Amino acid sequence: MAQVQYYGTGRRKHSVARVRLVPGEGRIVINKREMDTYFGLETLKLIVKQPLVLTETLGRYDVLVNVNGGGTTGQAGAIRHGVARALLKADPELRGALKRAGFLTRDPRMKERKKYGLKAARRAPQFSKR
């Protein structure tokens, strides 16, 4: 018998997360490591758990994640987006709650490109009057 799995892909900044929800006891595994060892900051762990807490499905599914690209904040946001999409496939009734919380919306904010003549995207070289 095939095991029931729900897939979701999440993106944030330059990170892409492929998320699988498997009925289980609530373990969250990111790149074959437990979430507690993968993310050091408590805020990042909270970001990942937000859709599960909102929909009250925290202990119902094991979350298996493959994530690459970007930094820790981008990866946490991508995982949150992917978990929300996977939960939607598991139970379409949750769409309203997830949409209101903004978890189904891809965050469009990206790093601004560096411009020539400047040191960074907007940082100008030091101005000398004389």
Swiss-Prot record:
Gene Ontology CC terms: cytosolic small ribosomal subunit
Record has Endoplasmic reticulum as a keyword: no
Record bears the keyword Ribosomal protein: yes
GO molecular function annotations of the record: RNA binding; structural constituent of ribosome
UniProt xrefs under SUPFAM superfamilies: Ribosomal protein S5 domain 2-like
Pfam families for this protein: Ribosomal_S9
Source taxon at top rank: Bacteria
GO biological process terms held by the UniProt record: translation
Keywords: Ribonucleoprotein, Ribosomal protein
InterPro entries referenced in this protein's UniProt entry, alphabetically: Ribosomal_Su5_D2-typ_SF (IPR020568), Ribosomal_uS9 (IPR000754), Ribosomal_uS9_bac/plastid (IPR023035), Ribosomal_uS9_CS (IPR020574), Ribsml_uS5_D2-typ_fold_subgr (IPR014721)
The family this protein is said to belong to: Belongs to the universal ribosomal protein uS9 family.
HAMAP family per the UniProt record, alphabetical: Ribosomal_uS9_B
Protein name, entry field: Small ribosomal subunit protein uS9
Protein's organism: Brevibacillus brevis (strain 47 / JCM 6285 / NBRC 100599)
Taxonomic lineage of the native organism: Bacteria, Bacillati, Bacillota, Bacilli, Bacillales
Gene: rpsI
